Structure formats: structure tokens, C-alpha cells
């Protein structure tokens, strides 16, 4: 999405039950990492099922600018010819990541650990997002910040060292992006780089580093073993790999909740990744009474995947503990929508990280609920939604603030609300789920553009 795109409003309205099957797009986290590790490996990495949304395509463009050879062989099928650790080239222009927070932050880890200089930029939303949490450990590892905006925001220029300094770093927030940036920088460090996190976050970087040949160990850490200590042996020779990208559970969240709240619905969502550090939403919905059956569990590309049969259900309010947040941080907007249709109160605790996503997601969700007549409150970093078991009133227009997940969440609300729901701009949905409207229309959803 360009910095000055014309808004594209979309309206969703209630209609017939949702029926049928769909496969959500490839996982965004794994797709980003496949491009980045393909760049840093020797040989030709082949990727099947890549998410071809704008975010991942920006990461692919950045990898190409840093020296990778990248070809698309067909839908979701890509080849990446890497340059190896230490083989990157200075890009000729700015690395424009659009809306891609994950891609920009992980690539800062790559640049910040290697002898290369690059300027990072993005759209209006990305320019508001904090990068200091990424830059601080990279500076400890030898990176130099040549220019930056207030608060360490993009556009910024980063220069990496000849060799990174191996460090032990305790992440100040539960963030897979911070952890991953440090580990990626540590690939060019002579020694062991260790990241300590107080709560386990999604572990795709660790899994994929091993797939490409790095030595990574993970040990329980801290009180009751809830945290993790991840140690990477630096300066390995990464070898090209075959990557099969499973369906993204964060994208699957939208048809899952739609099927639960639209009366009479019965939908099968195929090939969804069941990594336990990504299934917090499914766990929570089942606690609320959701009829979700896991079928045909199997292994794809080192991850457990399953087909999910989801049937319309009466939901009840629950309390979602803060320690579950890392396993569902991107799913709270659509969980809030489910809570609006539930009987009773749902309290989502410890949502401070939502304030620094593509938008201030906590405020954006609250505003969207208010616009559609849903009783709710924000208490500190907690979101409380009061439902009465009936459809949300709807009838409002939601400001998306260039946030794809806000847009999709409230379009899902509109499919079951008493009155249609409009989002002021749906263009950014393409960053993570380009076929969202088409997929849900295939199940019977009614959208007007």
C-alpha cells in the first residue's frame, strides 16, 4: 500500500449461514523468515505456500536489494539464491517495507550484524511504530545508527559491523521480533549469542535456523520455567533448504470467528498451523464454548497442521490471562468481536503490546466496539467486553488506522451484527490476506465495496 493510497471502504452485512471449505494464506511469520534465511544461506532455497501479501513481498524486495536472487515459479512457489553470511551488498536505494513491521525489524537484525549499510522506511503506520527495542541490542552488538527519527522510528539508516559482538540479552518485552533480530545479528558473531525471554514467544526463528543448519539450543528459564534461554552458535554456514509454509493461524482467526457467530454456519478451514505458541485464540474460543474440531493432524515443514471444522456456537465470556498474550497477540481484535456476541463478560488482560502494533490496536478496537454499540471498557491494559448473547448492534463505521487486522475483525462483526458494519479502508487487508474477501464470499459472506 503506498503512502498516499485512496481509501477503499467496505461494508459487511448479515446474510446466509457460512458453508464450505477454505485454506487461509501461508503463515506470514514463516514467509518472512524463509526469504531472510534464504538470503543468508548458500544455494537455492525453495519455498512452497509463501504468503504473497504486500508485507512479505516487501521483505522479498529487500532481500533482493541486499544481493539475493529471487524468482517466482507460480502461486506461492518461490526460489531464493542466497549470498551467505557476510556476503550482503549495500542496497542502491531505500528499503521500503510499507506496513511490514515484522519484515523491517527482522531485516534490521540482519543488517545490524553484518558489514552493510541500509536505510529503512515504511508507510505512515510503520513510521509510528517503535524500533528502539530492536536498535538497542543491535548497538550493543556493534551496529551504528547513522540517522533516525524521534524515538528510533523509521526512516532510519543502520550500519552493521565487520563482525557482530556476541551478547546475552534479556528482552524487555515479550517479543518474537526482538528475539529474532538479535539471533539474526548473532549469525555473524564469533561466539554464542543468547536471548533470554521471560515468557515464551513464537519460535519460528529458532526452528527455521535449525532447518538451515544453525546450532540453536533452547532451555527453560526463570520462575516455574515459563521463560526461555535461546543460545545461537555464531558464524555457521547456512545451507539452502526446502520450506513448506503452513496456513497462517492469525489469518485463519477471521473465518473461524465468522463461522462461530453467523448462525447455522459449518466451515472447514484447511491446513492451519497448530504450533502451541500460536494457538492461544483457539484455546480461548474453546473455553468460551466454541465447537472447533481438529481433523487430519499432520506434519508440514516441521510444524503440526490440522484442518479445523468450525460450527456456529453459543459463546460465554471468559477471562484471558496476560501470559496467553504472546500466543495470540495478533488475534485480540477478532476475539473482541467474538466476545461481543458472547453471553457475559470477557476480560482480556495485559494488552500493552497492542498499543504499538500497526495502530494503537487497543484504542482502535475500543473505538470500533463503541461505534457498533458494544458495551465495553478499557481498564489500564485490559479490555473488557460485555455481551448479552445476542448479535452485536452494528451499524457503525470503523476507523482502521491502516491496520489490516482491525479491518478484517470488524468486517467479520458485520457478517452477524444487527446492522451492517463499514470499515473506512480495506486496502491494507492485502498486507496479510489478499484473498480475504474472495475466500469469505466463497463461504456465503456478503460484502459491498
UniProtKB/Swiss-Prot annotation:
The protein's name in its UniProt record: 3-phosphoshikimate 1-carboxyvinyltransferase
Membership in a protein family: Belongs to the EPSP synthase family.
Disordered: annotated span: 1-29
Class of the enzyme per the UniProt entry, highest EC level: transferase
GO BP terms in the entry: amino acid biosynthetic process; aromatic amino acid family biosynthetic process; chorismate biosynthetic process
EC number: 2.5.1.19
GO cellular component terms attached to this protein's record: cytoplasm
Pathway entry: Metabolic intermediate biosynthesis; chorismate biosynthesis; chorismate from D-erythrose 4-phosphate and phosphoenolpyruvate: step 6/7
InterPro entries reported for this sequence: Enolpyruvate_Tfrase_dom (IPR001986), Enolpyruvate_Tfrase_sf (IPR036968), EPSP_synthase (IPR006264), EPSP_synthase_CS (IPR023193), RNA3'P_cycl/enolpyr_Trfase_a/b (IPR013792)
Quaternary data: Monomer.
Binding site residues for 3-phosphoshikimate: 28-29, 33, 175, 177, 330, 357
UniProt entry keywords in alphabetical sequence: Amino-acid biosynthesis, Aromatic amino acid biosynthesis, Cytoplasm, Transferase
Molecular function, one GO term: 3-phosphoshikimate 1-carboxyvinyltransferase activity
Binding site for phosphoenolpyruvate: 28, 101, 129, 177, 361, 405
HAMAP family in UniProt: EPSP_synth
Record's keyword annotation contains Ribonucleoprotein: no
Reactions catalysed, as given in the entry: 3-phosphoshikimate + phosphoenolpyruvate = 5-O-(1-carboxyvinyl)-3-phosphoshikimate + phosphate
Amino acid at each position: 500500500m503506498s503512502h498516499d493510497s485512496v481509501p477503499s471502504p467496505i461494508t459487511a452485512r448479515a446474510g446466509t449461514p457460512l458453508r464450505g471449505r477454505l485454506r487461509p494464506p501461508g503463515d506470514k511469520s514463516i514467509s518472512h523468515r524463509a526469504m531472510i534465511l534464504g538470503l543468508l544461506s548458500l544455494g537455492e532455497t525453495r519455498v512452497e505456500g509463501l504468503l504473497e501479501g504486500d508485507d512479505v513481498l516487501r521483505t522479498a524486495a529487500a532481500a533482493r536489494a541486499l544481493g539475493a536472487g529471487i524468482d517466482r515459479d507460480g502461486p506461492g512457489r518461490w526460489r531464493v539464491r542466497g549470498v551467505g553470511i557476510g556476503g550482503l551488498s549495500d542496497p542502491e536505494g531505500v528499503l521500503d517495507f510499507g506496513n511490514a513491521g515484522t519484515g523491517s525489524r527482522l531485516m534490521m537484525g540482519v543488517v545490524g550484524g553484518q558489514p552493510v549499510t541500509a536505510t529503512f522506511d515504511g508507510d505512515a503506520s510503520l513510521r509510528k511504530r517503535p524500533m528502539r527495542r530492536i536498535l538497542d541490542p543491535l548497538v550493543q552488538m556493534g551496529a551504528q545508527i547513522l540517522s533516525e527519527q524521534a524515538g528510533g522510528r523509521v526512516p532510519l539508516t543502520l550500519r552493521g559491523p565487520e563482525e557482530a559482538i556476541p551478547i546475552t540479552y534479556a528482552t524487555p518485552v515479550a517479543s518474537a521480533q526482538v528475539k529474532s533480530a538479535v539471533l539474526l545479528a548473532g549469525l555473524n558473531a564469533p561466539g554464542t549469542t543468547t536471548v533470554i525471554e521471560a515468557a515464551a514467544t513464537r519460535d519460528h526463528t529458532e526452528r527455521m535456523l535449525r532447518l538451515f543448519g544453525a546450532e540453536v539450543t533452547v532451555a527453560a528459564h526463570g520462575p516455574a520455567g515459563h521463560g526461555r534461554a535461546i543460545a545461537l552458535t555464531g558464524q555457521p554456514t547456512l545451507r539452502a533448504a526446502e520450506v513448506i509454509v503452513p496456513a497462517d493461524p492469525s489469518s485463519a482467526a477471521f473465518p473461524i470467528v465468522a463461522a462461530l457467530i453467523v448462525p447455522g454456519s459449518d466451515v472447514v478451514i484447511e491446513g492451519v498451523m497448530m504450533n502451541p505458541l500460536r494457538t492461544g485464540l483457539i484455546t480461548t474460543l474453546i473455553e468460551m464454548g466454541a465447537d472447533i474440531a481438529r481433523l487430519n493432524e499432520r506434519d508440514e515443514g516441521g510444524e503440526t497442521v490440522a484442518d479445523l471444522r468450525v460450527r456456529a456456537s453459543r459463546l460465554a465470556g471468559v477471562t484471558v490471562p496476560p501470559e496467553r498474550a504472546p500466543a495470540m497477540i495478533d488475534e485480540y481484535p477478532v476475539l473482541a468481536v467474538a466476545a461481543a456476541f458472547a453471553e457475559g463478560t470477557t476480560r482480556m488482560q495485559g494488552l500493552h503490546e497492542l498499543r504499538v502494533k500497526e495502530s494503537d490496536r487497543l484504542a482502535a478496537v475500543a473505538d470500533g466496539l463503541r461505534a457498533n454499540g458494544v458495551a465495553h471498557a478499557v481498564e489500564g491494559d485490559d479490555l473488557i467486553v460485555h455481551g448479552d448473547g445476542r448479535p452485536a448492534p452494528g451499524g457503525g463505521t470503523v476507523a482502521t488506522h491502516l491496520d489490516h487486522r482491525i479491518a478484517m475483525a470488524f468486517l467479520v462483526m458485520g457478517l452477524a451484527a444487527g446492522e451492517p458494519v463499514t470499515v473506512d479502508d480495506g486496502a491494507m487487508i492485502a498486507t496479510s490476506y489478499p484473498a480475504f474477501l474472495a475466500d469469505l464470499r466463497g463461504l456465503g459472506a456478503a460484502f459491498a465495496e
